[in-house]
Design a protein with these regions (language model features):
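A structural motif corresponding to the C-terminal lobe/cap of the Radical SAM core domain
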Residues: 125-141
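A cross-taxonomic marker for long C-terminal extensions/tails that follow the last structured domain
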Residues: 139-153
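Conserved AdoMet/S-adenosylmethionine-binding subsite of the radical SAM
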Residues: 1-124
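Class I S-adenosyl-L-methionine
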Residues: 68, 102, 136-143
Length: 153
């Protein structure tokens, strides 16, 4: 409703409407909100489904389908990768992730976020923080697959 209100109010039409999501919505849900959405930023916790399930409690199948669908309808603004050392920073996993995303498009904006312990729930406080060196390694992998729009956070 908020995005719809922004789009129909002439004094607010200049505002962009961007959605930050875990990507779990199905295409029927996307179809309801995309007409009033300028772009979508999707979090992909892990390309490997087993790792994704361990981290989030859910499969990544719908997340990957959402990324594909949003790209097809030209609403995918950015894919955000949360890098957690020992969980999803292995070179083989990074290459599989970069390869799959490059099959969608290398014009996708990639935001590489290093895991930080600040503000996380207690069950995740034992996870290791990502160092700048780890994030640089991830960036190089995506660069090697042709991605140009890579941001490290």
């Amino acid at each position: 409703e908020l995005f719809n209100s922004i789009k129909i109010d002439s004094s607010l039409k200049h505002l962009s409407t961007m959605l930050d999501t875990n990507g779990s919505a199905e295409s029927s849900t996307w179809n309801k909100i995309l007409p009033v959405t300028d772009g979508v930023m999707v979090d992909l916790k892990a390309f490997d489904d087993k790792v994704h399930q361990k981290l989030t409690g859910t499969s990544n199948v719908q997340v990957l389908q959402s990324i594909q669908y949003l790209h097809e309808v030209d609403k995918l603004f950015e894919v955000r990768l949360l890098i957690i050392p020992g969980w999803n920073d292995q070179e083989s996993m990074l290459q599989k992730t970069a390869e799959w995303l490059s099959q969608q498009s290398t014009n996708i904006s990639i935001k590489i976020l290093g895991f930080r312990q600040h503000g996380v729930r207690s069950e995740y406080s034992h996870l290791q923080q990502a160092t700048p060196e780890v994030l640089e390694k991830v960036s190089r992998t995506f660069h090697d697959f042709g991605f140009k729009r890579i941001q490290l956070v």
